[in-house]
Amino acid sequence: MVLSAADKGNVKTVFGKIGGHAEEYGAETLQRMFQTFPQTKTYFPHFDLQPGSAQIKAHGKKVAAALVEAANHIDDIAGALSKLSDLHAQKLRVDPVNFKFLGHCFLVVLAIHHPSLLTPEVHASMDKFLCAVATVLTAKYR
């Protein structure tokens, strides 16, 4: 999916606004995904999946860092997330649909915390961006 200049601007604006909350939102996104799509828990059998657990927060921080990295390198998401793509495809073997679930949950978290920011145009841009991230993360599954 090709991101237009307007899409790229919208994505950068969103990440600029969420700034210091990215880690918090990453953990909240994971927690929401585990609750809404319980099958995703199978990849975390060693985690304490209770809300607010240190493991959820730590992994949420990694999720947030990857999304920020992708946003910071929006013209080369594949390059920015290449190692992460390798990890998920070759070692972790995460079901590709989980990346779509994660993107959906991230949009919900954004909508909860920043309802006025998520206009229809920004929502569409973020959805395209998150789909692009999911596509990159699943590209090496073939």
Curated annotation (Swiss-Prot):
Q: Which GO terms describe its cellular component?
A: blood microparticle; haptoglobin-hemoglobin complex; hemoglobin complex
Q: Which UniProt keywords apply?
A: Heme, Iron, Metal-binding, Oxygen transport, Transport
State one molecular function term (GO).
haptoglobin binding
UniProt entry tagged with the keyword Transport = yes
Question: One short Pfam family name for this protein?
Answer: Globin
Can you cite a GO biological process for this protein? hydrogen peroxide catabolic process
Its tissue distribution reads:
Red blood cells.
Annotated Globin domain ranges read 2-142
Q: Which SUPFAM superfamilies match?
A: Globin-like
Against InterPro entries, the record matches this protein to: Globin, Globin-like_sf, Globin/Proto, Hemoglobin_a-typ, Hemoglobin_oxygen_transport, Hemoglobin_pi
Q: Would I find Iron among this entry's keywords?
A: yes
Disulfide pairings: none
**What is its quaternary makeup?**
Heterotetramer of two alpha chains and two beta chains.
Role summary = Involved in oxygen transport from the lung to the various peripheral tissues.
Identify its protein family.
Belongs to the globin family.
Its recorded name reads Hemoglobin subunit alpha-A
What organism is listed for this UniProt entry?
Answer: Anseranas semipalmata (Magpie goose)
